[in-house]
C-alpha cells in the first residue's frame, strides 16, 4: 500500500484563501481551503474537473475522513505526526495534511 500526502503549503495568516490542483487516480480536483476568523478554523470545498462542487464548506478538523462516490479513495485530514490537537492558522500548513492510500498492484 502506498500512502500519498497533500500538504497545505502557502496557507497562512497572509494567505487565508488557497486553491490546490490535485490529480487522484486520473481525476482532477481543486481543493479550496479558506480560513474563517469567526470560527477560527479552515473550511474545505472540493470541485471536480467540471468545477462542480463534490464537497462543499466542511470544517477541516483533525481526523476528518472524506468519503464521496466521486472521489476514488477515502481522504483523511490529520496532523502529520499523529498528534490530536486541532489546526490553527499558524500550524495548518506546517503540521497538517490530506492523506490517502492506494493498494499496490501485485
Pin down the residues of each PLM region:
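Acidic, aromatic-enriched beta-alpha/helix-loop junctions
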Residues: 35-83
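Residues that cap or initiate secondary-structure elements
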Residues: 12, 28, 37-39, 50, ...
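C-terminal low-complexity, charged extensions that often adopt amphipathic alpha-helices
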Residues: 77-106
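Short beta-strand/loop motifs in extracellular/secreted proteins, especially
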Residues: 18-20, 42, 96
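Short, charged/polar N-terminal "headpieces" of proteins
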Residues: 1-32
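Short, surface-exposed loop and linker segments with low hydrophobicity and enrichment for Pro/Ser/Thr
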Residues: 24-40, 89-90
Amino acid at each position: 500500500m502506498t500512502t500519498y500526502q497533500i500538504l497545505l503549503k502557502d496557507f497562512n495568516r497572509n494567505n487565508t484563501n488557497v486553491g490546490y490542483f490535485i490529480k487522484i487516480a486520473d481525476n482532477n480536483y481543486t481543493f479550496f481551503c479558506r480560513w474563517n476568523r469567526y470560527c477560527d478554523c479552515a473550511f474545505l470545498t472540493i470541485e471536480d474537473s467540471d468545477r462542480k462542487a463534490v464537497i462543499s464548506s466542511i470544517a477541516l478538523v483533525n481526523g476528518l475522513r472524506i468519503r464521496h462516490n466521486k472521489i476514488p479513495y477515502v481522504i483523511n485530514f490529520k496532523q502529520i505526526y499523529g498528534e490530536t490537537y486541532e489546526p490553527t492558522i499558524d500550524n495548518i500548513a506546517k503540521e497538517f495534511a490530506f492523506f490517502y492510500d492506494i493498494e499496490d498492484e501485485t
